[in-house]
Each structure stands twice: as C-alpha cells, then as structure tokens.
C-alpha cells in the first residue's frame, strides 16, 4: 500500500497530520499539515509540497500496488507541487483509493472530472454497501494490471 493518510492529532491536539499509508501515524511538527482550533484552521502548504510529494514519489519508486489518498480537500488549495503530483498519479496505472471533499474547489474539481476517476458518493443510506462496492472496483482494477 502506498500513498498517504491525513488524520487529527490525539486529544486535545486538533491539528491535522500526514504520514505515508504504510507507516504508523506520526504527530511531529514536520508531519503537521494544518493548525486547528475550535473555530478555524491554518494549512501549511509547504508540508504538502515537500512531505506529501515525497510520499507520492516513494510510492512510485517502490511500485506500490495501490495508492491511498485520504483525504484530498481545501487544505491543499495552495500546495501546487502536491496538486501536480496527485494529478500525475491519476495518469499512472496504479489504482488509487481516495477520499475527495465534495465542496466545489477548482483543484478538486479537476480530480472529480478526471477521466480515470470513478466517484462513489457516500450517504447514510448507502454507506453500509460501500466496502463491497470498493472491493469490487479494486479487484477489477488489480486484475487488469496482472
């Protein structure tokens, strides 16, 4: 498994962090992608542009069979190198399982409208069926690579 995960800090830490999907979560300043408090957040674009890009490059170098991108959203809106790296990954053959914010954000719209992307909307009504839907799509995608 390649790619990245983003996750909140351990209570009372509200900040958001990023780590490679294949490593344990890290709560270090160099992994912090956004500072949050109860009312607002302050993203650190340079962390996406350095660590985020590095994680995606390492995933390619080590030829991971599946990339995780959890999640893509508004924190990355000024992380142009990271955006470019994500879009390059979409051109590759490696399947990607990602979570994309629904909000209309130009760089996310580029992902949502990409010809290699299949969106699976999740709602309260269908969320119990989503794991089997994802498994079916990934199984089909991985078979194409063999």
Where are these regions (language model features)?
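N-terminal phosphate/diphosphate-binding loop that engages ATP/GTP or pyrophosphate donors
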Residues: 1-39
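Generic structural hydrophobic/aromatic packing signal, biased to beta-strands
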Residues: 4, 18, 52, 119-122, ...
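Phosphate-binding/switch loop-helix module in NTP-utilizing enzymes
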Residues: 36-88
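Residue-level preference for the first positions of well-ordered beta-strands
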Residues: 2, 64-68, 95-97
